[in-house]
UniProtKB/Swiss-Prot annotation:
Domain notes for this protein: Consists of three domains; the N-terminal catalytic domain, the editing domain and the C-terminal C-Ala domain. The editing domain removes incorrectly charged amino acids, while the C-Ala domain, along with tRNA(Ala), serves as a bridge to cooperatively bring together the editing and aminoacylation centers thus stimulating deacylation of misacylated tRNAs.
GO molecular function: alanine-tRNA ligase activity; aminoacyl-tRNA deacylase activity; ATP binding; tRNA binding; zinc ion binding
Pfam families for the chain: DHHA1, tRNA-synt_2c, tRNA_SAD
Named cofactor requirement(s): Zn(2+)
Name listed for the protein in its UniProt record: Alanine--tRNA ligase
Keyword field contains Aminoacyl-tRNA synthetase: yes
Annotated Zn(2+) binding sites: 611, 615, 714, 718
EC number(s) on file: 6.1.1.7
CDD domains in the cross-refs: AlaRS_core
Keyword Metal-binding (UniProt): yes
Length: 923
């Protein structure tokens, strides 16, 4: 369908001919008149291994600089890389391509690009081939996509296909690449609702670059069909290129694998720690690695069947058995994967991702745990942070990673500890799950393995190992981690918001938000544009509509004859709807009326103080805890506010004190709160992506709020200066989910009231203990010590009572099949006494004990000595059945169990039932 798109003057004027690949059937352009295949794997093998294709070798830094300088000389503006966590996107967690930097606002034409044309080297992370990393010799989780982009409009073209092709060819020529070795393969591209013709740049079996010419958008009525979808022309059109930095380096060196080209020092270090020799100057060994990489280019090695096939082919080609080859390759592949994964983690953690069980944090933890598992397999006994430190030393272009390294180390210590704990707990969880499937005679299914990993972090390899001990089979695909990564790679699609009164509102203009122009004004006049169901739409308003975690303003709307209370304000597609209280149903307002609005000043100021305080506390937390701190959510109320922060551990009391002190210092500095409307591009360039802590607002213009050093895109109401906020008091913190700390605080009058409440509690407590407030800690500590001593004495006394009671109970025991059975109601005993008595009786192997009490509600305890256990008596089963009769429940171990209920009238029935069950078991 796009065949005509490739009929370029560039090809015609530079000696190219269009051919059809005899292997894959795709069309390609080449200067080599004798070429029969397209140059892509698997149609062509990797012939660059051992045969570098450029005139010189490059390392990563040298290649990146060569590329960017080349395009600067060709009129492109170099721009800085974006983070690998896509802070500017709400549909994507990780940056997967350079074009993702400019989606959706630049690519849609809403916002101008930061430069045009531009060049960038963008670090990207893709986990969809996670299981192929290390095995294939070429796959990476993290790679830099070098790119040159041009953003064109129909009335203003920067450059298009012809010049893009010329630039690419000139770059390759400047590297002294043999022109006959280059193929340009036609391959239509589609993704993310866009499409266009695409050219793959192929050399010696390796895809070095992809040139996408994005000029189509998904359209059910479109006339262009690509991969089963219809498209139509876009208003703008974009040159979207991607050159693989790491592949250029590999091709320049001709190393056996991409890992040896990129990280030779780290690979050698890890090989040594694993007790392996990595002698690339040994031609036989180097040939094994090279042949493995060459043949891996022909297949997907993430699947076991293909991996085995690869092993067979490599073994056959070098005259070695498959088992011997596997013994050589498997540990080497793990070293390669560890090297790659730790580089990936350097970018992830260095750019502020906090490992957790959700979103980008989940993906970071996935990579961490997979790495730790492989390190365990190879018995590499160094901290993860040591390997990351090696990477950071090799990346001077990223000084931020060195600055953040202390936090990275701390995060990894925490994550390794969690991983070890998971492994310990995981064994018990798997045993329980495997026991269930053993009863049914089934293998543990993939869905259960996925659940075990998602919910508990238990890797499938461990599940297989533990389950096999119980005799239960486990099978999982070799691309298990790729599947998991793909499942969690994208944000959940938001349900399309149902706009109430959509038909009613769609004809109305957007409401002017006058409170932005005059933030301190609270009274105003407005024209009624519509009124329905106690809802009023005005031409302009000073009422803030609920949004950004800030509740709506309240107040009144008045006519000459009546005053109506405003109880809610919401915004729908830019139209602000005021809901009024109208209990008698008589509404004396009509379209076109001029009304007077009055905002509740106390509520507005209280919420503005809390909103401004949220910025202040966020900034203080970042300064105390580290630059990784990211706002994960916020909500303001009149009496307090809460701020959710991404952080890898609990905030300590000392850190909270520092945050609170720093926040109040910012208040006392009385800095002006600055708000301004800026173009999105300008704001991002000046302030970075910390702008989007509160979410990503739409539009070309965004409202930027500066509170001290905190700068965010924010639509809320704020104080005119930090001094107006008043005192800030942190009330409490809690961990609401893994990786997220919630900080609750109050500001202004609410903070004073909170402090007064705390003072009252202290005063009342001091009064109760008859000591001055300043002596309260010492007094509480003394009383607590005395209480602990009394508790110990009480426990000793209960043990003595239990021992004394044992002889009496044994004397009244019943004989059942050679066992002594005690069934006794002890009304005065608490649960601890019952437990100690039953435990004491466990010393007698032939005794079964059934005890009950109603001193603390109905309590039941059962125990069974060793002889009783061998007869089939199970204390847990006894208690479960007895507890049912007293309207309760219970359970425990076969030797000792506890339970209870709410019906004391059935205690004797429960004891009788227990005795009956013992007799049945002894038959």
């Amino acid at each position: 369908m796009l065949e005509d798109e490739y009929q370029l003057e560039f090809f015609k004027n530079n000696g190219f001919v269009r051919k059809q690949c005899q292997s894959c059937g795709k069309f390609f352009w080449t200067r080599d008149l004798d070429r029969k295949t397209c140059g892509d794997a698997p149609c062509d093998p990797y012939t660059f291994i051992g045969n570098p294709i450029f005139s010189r070798e490059f390392d990563i830094s040298q290649m990146r600089e060569y590329y960017l300088s080349f395009f600067e000389e060709k009129g492109h503006t170099r721009i800085n890389r974006y983070p690998v966590v896509a802070r500017w996107r709400d549909d994507l967690y990780l940056t997967i391509a350079s074009i993702a930097d400019f989606q959706p606002f630049v690519t849609s034409g809403q916002v101008p690009p930061p430069a045009n044309p531009l060049t960038i080297s963008q670090p990207c992370i893709r986990l969809n081939d996670l299981d192929s990393v290390g095995r294939s010799g070429r796959h990476l989780t993290t790679f830099e996509m070098m790119a040159h982009h041009a953003f064109n409009k129909r009335d203003h073209e920067i450059y298009w296909k012809e010049h893009a092709m010329e630039l690419c060819d000139e770059l390759l020529t400047s590297l002294k690449l043999d022109p006959l070795a280059v193929s340009y393969k036609e391959e239509p591209w589609a993704g993310g609702g866009n499409a266009g013709p695409c050219v793959e740049v192929l050399v010696h079996g390796l895809e070095l670059a992809t040139l996408v010419f994005m000029d189509l958008k998904a359209d059910k009525k479109g006339d262009v069909l690509i991969k089963g979808e219809t498209y139509s022309k876009m208003d703008n059109y974009i040159v979207d290129t991607g050159y693989g930095l790491e592949r250029f380096v590999w091709a320049s060196k001709g190393s056996p694998t991409i890992y040896d080209a990129l990280f030779p020092g780290i690979v050698n270090e890890l090989m040594g720690l694993a007790g392996l020799e990595h002698e690339l100057d040994n031609s036989e060994y180097a040939n094994i690695l090279a042949q493995n990489a060459r043949l891996a280019g022909f297949m997907d090695v993430s699947e076991q069947s293909n991996l085995l096939e690869l092993r067979k082919k490599v073994a056959s080609s070098i005259g070695m058995t498959v088992d011997k080859l596997s013994a050589i390759m498997e540990p080497v592949e793990k070293v390669y994967a560890i090297t790659d994964h730790t580089r990936c983690l350097t970018f992830m953690l260095g750019d502020g991702i906090i490992p957790s069980n959700v979103k980008a944090g989940y993906l970071a933890r996935l990579v961490i745990r997979r790495t730790l598992r492989m390190m365990d397999d190879l018995d590499i006994r160094i901290p993860l942070s040591e390997i990351m430190d090696m990477h950071i030393k090799n990346m001077p272009e990223y000084p931020e990673f060195r600055e953040n390294f202390p936090v990275i180390q701390d995060i990894l210590v925490s994550e390794e500890e969690k991983f070890r704990n998971t492994m310990e707990k995981g064994r018990r969880i798997i045993q329980k799950s495997a026991s269930h499937f053993k009863k049914t005679g089934e293998k543990i299914p993939l869905s259960q393995l996925t659940e075990l990993y998602d919910s508990h972090g238990i890797p499938p390899e461990m599940a297989k190992e533990v389950a096999s001990e119980i005799g239960v089979g486990v099978e999982f695909p070799d691309n298990f981690y790729s599947i998991i990564g793909e499942l969690h790679n994208k944000a959940e699609e938001k349900e399309e918001e149902v706009v109430p009164f959509a038909d009613r509102l769609k004809h109305l203009p957007k409401t002017k938000r006058s409170f932005y122009d005059e933030p301190t004004r609270l009274e105003f006049e407005a024209v009624v544009l519509d009124i329905f169901d106690n809802n009023i739409v005005l031409d302009n308003t000073f009422f803030y509509a609920e949004g950004g975690g800030q509740p709506a303003d309240m107040g009144t709307i008045a006519t000459a004859y009546a005053v109506y209370k405003v109880v809610d304000v919401q915004v729908y597609d830019g139209v602000i709807v005021h809901t009024i209280e109208n209990p008698d149903g008589n509404l004396d307002i009509r379209k076109g009326d001029i009304v007077n609005g009055k905002v509740d000043e106390k509520r507005r100021m209280t919420l503005a103080r809390h909103h401004t305080a949220t910025h202040i506390v966020n900034d203080a937390a970042r300064k105390v805890l580290g630059t990784h701190i990211w706002q994960a959510g916020a909500q303001k109320f009149e009496d307090h506010s809460r701020l959710d922060l991404s952080h890898y551990k609990h905030i300590s009391p000392d850190e909270l004190k520092q945050i609170e002190l720093l926040a109040n210092r910012m208040v006392m500095e009385n800095k002006r709160v600055v708000t301004e409307w800026m173009s999105r591009t300008e704001a991002e360039q000046e302030y970075g992506f910390g702008l989007y802590q509160g979410g990503v607002p739409p539009g070309e213009k965004i409202r930027v709020v500066k509170v001290g050093d905190d700068v965010e895109a924010c639509a809320g109401t704020h104080c005119v200066s930090t001094g107006v906020v008043g005192p800030i008091k942190i009330l409490r913190t809690e961990r609401i989910q893994d990786g997220v700390e919630r900080v609750e605080f109050a500001a202004g009058v609410a903070a004073v009231r909170a402090m007064q409440k705390i003072d009252s509690l202290l005063s009342d407590s001091a009064k109760t203990l008859s000591v001055p407030p300043e002596q309260l800690p010492a007094s509480v500590e003394r009383f607590f010590g005395e209480w602990k001593d009394l508790k110990k004495e009480n426990e000793k006394l209960k043990e003595e009572i239990a021992r004394a009671r044992v002889y009496r109970l044994l004397g009244g025991a019943s004989e059942v099949a050679g066992l002594k059975v005690i069934a006794e109601f002890i009304p005065e005993a608490d649960s601890l006494e019952l437990q100690k008595t039953a435990t004491e009786l466990l010393k007698h192997e032939d005794v079964v004990t059934l005890l009950a009490s109603d001193a603390e509600g109905v309590k039941l305890v059962a125990s069974a000595g060793q002889k009783a256990l061998s007869c089939g008596i199970n204390a847990g089963s006894l208690v479960r059945e007895m507890s049912k009769l007293v309207s309760g429940g219970g359970g425990g171990k076969p030797a000792l169990a506890m339970g209870g209920g709410t019906d004391p009238s059935k205690i004797q029935d429960a004891l009788a039932r227990g005795l009956e069950l013992v007799k049945e078991a002894c038959k």
